[in-house]
């Protein structure tokens, strides 16, 4: 079992303990997508890891912690729609140049930085204030698992 499989399974285990519905794997086709914001269209490192997560669970959610899926029933938690919104005139944030938003919790945003190839948690208001910087998506998911366990020790 890969580290990503372990992380996704553990996140979903906690989610299920909290009473949330676990999302099935994404079975659709992945297309090239232009995220804009100075992000080159080809993102093999991003898509390899994110695609692997989606093929296990098309969206992770537990207690306000979410990693976006593709074409989910909750369009506000759709990876492509959320990133398209960041390109809307008036909503642009120069600090999100080169960053693919992949999720959030109540206080922070999760993104993939295409220039340094890192998976990052930053403050929702101060996007330039990095809280966690990880080599892999699995490591980033593990940071959220630790937070969930810490704040819900009675059920985890």
Segments and roles (model prediction):
Residues 1-109:
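A surface-exposed partner-binding patch
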Residues 106-107, 126-128:
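Glycine-centered tight beta-turn/hairpin loop motif at sheet-sheet or coil-to-beta transitions
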Residues 116-124:
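Short aromatic-glycine-(Arg/Gly/Cys) micro-motifs in beta-strand/loop hairpins
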Residues 129-149:
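Compact, glycine/acidic-enriched structural inserts
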Residues 152-156:
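Short acidic DE-rich linear segments
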């Amino acid at each position: 079992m890969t580290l990503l499989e372990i992380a996704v399974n553990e996140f979903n285990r906690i989610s299920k303990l909290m009473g949330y519905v676990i999302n099935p794997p994404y079975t659709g086709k992945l297309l090239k997508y232009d995220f804009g914001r100075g992000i080159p269209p080809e993102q093999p490192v991003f898509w390899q890891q994110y695609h692997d997560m989606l093929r296990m669970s098309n969206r992770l959610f537990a207690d306000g912690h979410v990693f976006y899926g593709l074409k989910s029933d909750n369009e506000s938690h759709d990876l492509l729609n959320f990133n398209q919104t960041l390109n809307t005139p008036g909503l642009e944030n120069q600090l999100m140049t080169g960053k693919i938003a992949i999720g959030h919790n109540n206080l922070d945003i999760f993104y993939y930085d295409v220039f340094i190839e890192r998976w990052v948690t930053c403050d929702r208001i101060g996007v330039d204030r990095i809280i966690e910087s990880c080599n892999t998506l699995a490591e980033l998911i593990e940071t959220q698992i630790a937070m969930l366990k810490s704040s819900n020790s009675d059920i985890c």
